[in-house]
């Protein structure tokens, strides 16, 4: 029987169009895009074409900001982890000491929280804001904590664990009113929910979360925002991000972004259909983690008292999904996101995350949820 993939928040299947765009640059068109000869210039042209495709997807109509070099620039990176590290460390380094105060949320990705913690050890002042049981930030609370001494506010568009959509435009407005930079981790929301690019100063995205290849991401930087380089060496990407770019990875990212832009309405409708039918195959006892209203519809993070997710995954090997409580290190500690929304350790440890999207069929989703529910029933009642 074919496996059923329901782990779209971890990574997405590579789009055939992205694979096709990459293939020539993995075979005979192998030149270094930073070389001055003809083959190098061809590779460089492919990188620049991909850059424009990602920019177009970041800033789609109708909420269109004029896409020009003087509005903002897109820099390719090895992924969103690098982009977020660079944005935080590169921007804070350029701020005066009295503005080196960072405000972020307790539910952010480890790439943000660990970077912020490191900056704290380097002397920055940190303020990590709590969220409510629904996973959303209280804007009144945020308004009181973002002060004239705040240099950076960082928040993700869509949470990678519970799919909650934060009010990014409002948070960015609070930051701008105080003269602070605003960094948006748009990895999970890019192309799926509206991104208020005009309100942001820095935006991080990743290719493999939008049906592109792993190993490439990007950081969008508004004109006038100064960053210290994170990587030093050959001076690529305008001297701000050293390292030889892969034309293949960039081309794959560009093709995936272009496809995402062209399919955005179709993909949105498909995710809504899947979400509408997702809860029906589950029996009583399952509870949703995070807001149901302010949520990306391709994420289902649920819990059931007494269920062991590790055993569940072993019993339902046909379905690829995630345990909602395992931290990145694999230590078995409950997820910081689930703890931040007020779940007890036992509740967090009985949570699972199901992610679905473009290539998930309705039959696959129903089959997977039925198998998971039946396995949970067997766990809780061995007599079944």
Model-derived features: where do they sit?
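Pyridoxal 5′-phosphate
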Residues: 1-384
